[in-house]
Design a protein with these regions (language model features):
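Structural recognition of the beta-strand scaffold that forms the well-ordered cores
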Residues: 41-45, 53-55, 97-100, 134, ...
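C-terminal substrate/ligand-recognition segments
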Residues: 33-52, 80-86, 90, 125-150
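Proteins synthesized as precursors that undergo proteolytic processing into mature forms
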Residues: 61-63, 74, 89, 95-96, ...
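Mid-domain, small-residue-enriched loop/turn segments at the edges of structured enzyme/sensor domains
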Residues: 113-119, 152-189, 198, 202-205
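A penicillin-recognizing enzyme superfamily signal
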Residues: 1-46, 55, 61-66, 80, ...
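Conserved catalytic neighborhood of penicillin-recognizing serine enzymes
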Residues: 93-154, 200, 212-237, 241-242
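Active-site SXXK
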Residues: 49-50, 73-101, 135, 190-194, ...
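Short active-site loop at a secondary-structure junction
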Residues: 31-40, 63-83, 96-101, 129-130, ...
Length: 254
């Protein structure tokens, strides 16, 4: 039977972080073993040229034939919030504008009970006036919910599409919680827009292909689009710096 085969010891070669080893284990145990592997990815892009400088798609490709940079989609969590704040900057808001830090409710179709996002920031600031810069720095859901009430979810999705997002993003109020599954390649390209003065540059892996004699077989041109004004990009850089200087990302400075 299948279960008998899956629980029968079998000689096999398995992957370790330090290399390969020959061992004996059941196919069932080998599946469990590989499930314990950390499946992370890493991408570094020059924001001005789009040239990819570093790329890690996952562990050994001989054993994990799946690219976590260009194939894998994951929920992005609060890293999606800057795009909501970008819409606000496009509509005349500034990092210094103040908002009351209180719960916000959303009436959902077919649901008699309104949805109220929970706070994710310091409780001693509840009910106080806080700046948008503070709201993003602390990743406070109350402020993100207020922004979502001010602007349609579809406006955020439209902006993200212009910033290179090709994954499906459902235009619902909970979008600011990062419920959408997005590729790392798309997120890196979108974030690079802020560092490139508002110009989106798609990550570029190959500039040209040559044959063995050095003759150019094919050339590739960069895909760029001006998404934000330089002033809007500057405001967003100021907001993002606040995350590291005074907010939830300050541990990066230690």
């Amino acid at each position: 039977s299948i279960m008998l085969a899956f629980n029968t010891n079998t000689p096999m070669k398995v992957c370790l972080w330090r290399g390969e080893i020959d061992t004996i284990m059941t196919p069932y145990d080998s599946v469990r073993y590989y499930k314990y592997f950390l499946r992370s990815s890493f991408l570094v892009e020059d924001p001005h040229t789009g040239y990819v400088k570093a790329y890690v798609g996952g562990p050994d490709f001989r054993y994990f034939k799946w690219d976590a940079v260009t194939q894998q989609r994951k929920q992005v969590g609060s890293t999606i919030k800057p795009f909501l704040y970008t819409v606000a900057m496009q509509n005349g808001y500034t990092p210094c504008d103040e908002v009351e830090n209180i719960p916000r409710s959303f009436d959902l179709p077919g649901d008699s009970v309104p949805w109220i996002p929970r706070s994710s920031g310091p409780k001693d600031y509840h009910g106080k006036m806080v700046t948008l810069k503070w709201g993003l720095a602390q990743s406070e859901n109350y402020i993100s919910a207020w922004l979502m009430q001010m602007f349609r979810p579809s406006a955020v999705v439209d902006l993200m599409k212009r910033m290179g997002m090709r994954s499906f993003i459902d235009p619902v109020p909970s979008i600011f919680l990062g419920t959408s599954d997005i590729k790392l390649e798309e997120m890196v390209g979108a974030y690079s827009t802020y560092a490139n003065r508002g110009v989106y540059t798609r990550p570029m892996y190959v500039t040209r292909i040559e044959d063995k004699n050095g003759n150019v077989v094919s050339r590739f041109t960069q895909q760029i689009e001006e998404v934000l004004s330089e002033d809007q990009a500057y405001l967003m850089l100021d907001l993002l710096q606040g995350v590291v200087l005074i907010g939830s990302g300050n541990r990066l400075r230690r």
